[in-house]
Amino acid sequence: MWQETDQKKSIADDSDMAELSFSVNCRELPYDHAYELSSEILNLIPQIKNDKRNSIQTLHGPMSGNGWVRPDSENIPLSKRAKLIMRINKNQIDDIKDIEGKEIKLFGNSLKIGVSKVKNFLIVKDLFCRFVISDKKISEDDFLEKIQMELRNFNVNIKKALCGRSMTINFDKNTVYTRSLMIADLSKEESLKLQEEGVGGKKLYGCGIFLPHKSIDAVNNFKED
């Protein structure tokens, strides 16, 4: 896997988007907490809606323990290393940082938002998305074809793609059907574009956000051949 390691030469430096990572202090949350978390964040910083590329990631603990995949209904413990990560237009970063020190209530737990750090995107060949909004009735092939058509608008041509696990997410009083997705063998320009734009809807609720495919939790999300 190639990976840009020299930040001075990274094409991500020229991007108008970046990651804003906040430390958090929270004991635990349910796996399915995207709607509640994002709703609280949007109440604090409604201006995050001003750029449709902006996104809010869900918080994640370990996806498996001793080889056993935890059920989606189980609460996840959050360590001191847990981060609240957003992808933000660089022009908005100072405004979004205003949530430092704020405290919100989620599922009876207190979540305190700490200091933030700004990071450029990590440019890698393979990207992974935990939750892509999908129609439950369509096949995996039709789903991938739909994704391919959307990404062509951003000059991203899919060479290799793999659907992973499907799951539903609670969204207010409704449920949303999602699939996980890995896209491989991207060019540097395509990798950056995918991380800037995402795919599909509800990016402010943890969906459609592409992450570097480098961690064990990403591997655990995919079905064996």
Where are these regions (language model features)?
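RNA-interacting cores
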Residues: M1-D225
